[in-house]
């Protein structure tokens, strides 16, 4: 299992999801839920799309990866690896944020 999975792409998904969740939650925690938080979240997503897009497609969301699998654009192994990477990135971001603001 996972012999053909592109680990560079999975690593990009882990890092991309980490940055999206960490910066997004930090922005909303410090700037509030108004324009500043939304702008920081959107700007982070835009930068990640340009940086991670060529490497992994910049899914950053298990629903996107599962949708690509359902439309036969990804293999089952790649989908599982992407989803696990995205979940890991989100948990690492939460732990980093909890450590930062505790």
Where are these regions (language model features)?
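Membrane-interface helix-loop junctions and terminal tails of multi-pass membrane proteins
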Residues: 1-102
